[in-house]
């Protein structure tokens, strides 16, 4: 039972933060009824009083900060109430039944989705991590607010990671970079993704982080006048053309630089988009007009013009990217997008969140399509290690953009093959594929696809997948579908062989399998610790 002094200290600190939260919510969504939020605050205050975090702060500060992040996303009162309650089941005596009774089914469903399964239920930490992620992703499908709370929770935990011992910092940072940063990326939430990744990099590789930070900071100071000059030139040209736009400059985030240096084996001086300018226009037409203007001023780098407006990324990110070479030979990236596109790039699925009767917008459904696919692909993966490794591939693939003959875009992992393409179209197309044409030319099934390839799959009825395909495919969908098919057909073959062996042995004792009742066969299987006669036959076969 907390002392009176502890209760007073907790109340004094948290009341101020709660008032800030309410002000933010009133500002963002003035017509919302905040009664459920106030009730959730009082409930959390009651049950978390006396608890402290590793920083020494009252524990309730954490749910309040999570709620503040959600308020910054302009989330609804139900989401923010769930944010205030998100640790109550995990860290207090409160149960989901209590939450449901006090706050209703919606809040209870969300809180249950973000609550970790007890560690007691698992043999290893890896198994616990895999099952908790699987649970969260299944809950996300029903209510995206589950993952938005989880991201807000992880963001505040990363912001306060300094208070934990180094070994825990490393584990949490690694999981953040492998799972939560990529999830934010997949949902188009660039702002949160960037902060999560930089914080993860800082704690996972503190020496590498500091070295890169010092190099980039030196470049930033050297480049301040250069950036001002570039902005001034663009503003002047836009004014001459009668285009109203916002022009700002930025330096690429540290983790993004780090990944590029690793992937391309280059130095910081060779990073084309270390410095970048962002031009935010009022209309789509102005985006393309601005692109023409900057190409008239500076020479574009061949192969560095990317039109993500005409062909959005899978997370629906839209922008024009171009790299140019300035008069003094400095490479420089310019991103051009509308205000609406910029909001979507920064906030992603949270940008237009309008929750109504449990439904999301068509655009948000498109964003969540990848999640539904991932859950489907992982359904048959029981091994925790395999689940985690394939999930990481699915969350953060290096993507290539290919096309069907009818022009439909098919996004695949880098170095994907026609087999991957076939399985992405349909499972049966994958199972029966015998060949492929890429850009009108016959290619082997091991052929590596590239962005822009037009792929036609050739199929043959009755054809079956080959085990050799597992060493060729790159997508987890293809790998899991092939494994699933092989497992089913291997089992069928094993049952057939086992049945023949049992019949042969039984005949020695003048016993005929066809005369045995199902209960007799089940009893024999049970004696060997097996659930069904087919399990017995498969084991023998």
Q: What would you call each of these model-derived segments?
A:
Residues 1-142:
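Metal-dependent phosphohydrolase cores
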């Amino acid at each position: 039972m907390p002392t009176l002094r502890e209760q007073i200290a907790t109340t004094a600190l948290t009341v101020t933060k709660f008032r800030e939260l309410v002000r933010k919510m009133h500002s963002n969504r003035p017509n919302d009824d905040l009664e459920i939020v106030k009730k959730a605050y009082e409930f959390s205050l009651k049950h978390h009083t006396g608890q402290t975090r590793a920083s020494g702060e009252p524990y309730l500060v954490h749910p309040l900060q999570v709620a503040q992040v959600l308020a910054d996303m302009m989330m609804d009162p139900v989401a923010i109430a769930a944010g205030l309650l998100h640790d109550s089941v995990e860290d207090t005596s409160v149960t989901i039944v209590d939450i449901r009774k006090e706050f209703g089914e919606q809040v209870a469903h969300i809180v249950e989705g973000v609550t970790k399964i007890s560690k007691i239920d698992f043999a290893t930490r890896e198994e616990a991590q895999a099952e908790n992620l699987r649970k969260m992703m299944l809950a996300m499908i029903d209510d995206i607010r589950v993952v938005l709370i989880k991201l807000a929770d992880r963001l505040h935990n990363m912001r306060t990671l300094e208070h934990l011992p180094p070994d825990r910092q490393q584990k949490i940072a690694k999981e953040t970079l492998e799972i939560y940063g990529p999830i934010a990326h997949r949902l188009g939430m660039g702002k949160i993704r960037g902060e999560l990744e930089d914080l993860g990099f800082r704690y996972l590789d503190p020496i590498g982080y500091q070295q890169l930070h010092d190099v980039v900071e030196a470049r930033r100071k050297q480049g301040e006048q250069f950036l001002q000059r570039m902005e001034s030139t663009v503003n002047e040209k836009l004014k001459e053309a009668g285009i109203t736009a916002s022009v700002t400059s930025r330096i690429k985030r540290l983790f993004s630089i780090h990944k590029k240096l690793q992937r391309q084996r280059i130095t910081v001086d060779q990073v084309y988009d270390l410095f970048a300018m962002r031009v935010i226009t009022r209309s789509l037409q102005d985006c393309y007009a601005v692109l023409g203007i900057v190409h008239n001023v500076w020479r574009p780098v061949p192969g560095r013009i990317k039109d993500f407006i005409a062909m959005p990324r899978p997370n629906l990110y839209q922008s024009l990217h171009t790299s140019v070479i300035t008069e003094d030979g400095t490479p420089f990236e310019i991103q051009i997008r509308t205000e609406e596109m910029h909001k979507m790039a920064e906030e992603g699925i949270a940008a237009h969140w309008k929750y109504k009767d449990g439904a999301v917008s068509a655009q948000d459904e498109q964003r969540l399509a990848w999640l539904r696919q991932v859950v489907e692909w992982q359904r048959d993966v029981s091994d925790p290690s395999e689940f985690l490794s394939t999930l990481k591939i699915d969350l953060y693939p290096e993507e290539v953009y290919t096309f069907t003959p009818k022009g439909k875009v098919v996004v695949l992992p880098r170095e994907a093959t026609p087999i991957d393409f076939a399985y992405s179209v349909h499972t049966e197309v994958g199972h029966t594929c015998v060949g492929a044409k890429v850009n009108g030319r016959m290619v082997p099934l091991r052929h590596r696809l590239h962005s822009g390839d037009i792929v036609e799959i050739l199929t043959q009825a009755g054809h079956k997948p080959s085990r050799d395909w597992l060493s060729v495919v790159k997508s987890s969908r293809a790998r899991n579908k092939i494994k699933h098919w092989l497992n089913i057909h291997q089992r069928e073959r094993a049952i057939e062989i086992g049945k023949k062996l049992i019949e042969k042995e039984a005949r020695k004792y003048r016993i005929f399998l066809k005369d045995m009742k199902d209960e007799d066969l089940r009893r024999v299987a049970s004696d060997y610790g097996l659930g069904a006669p087919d399990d017995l036959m498969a084991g023998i076969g």
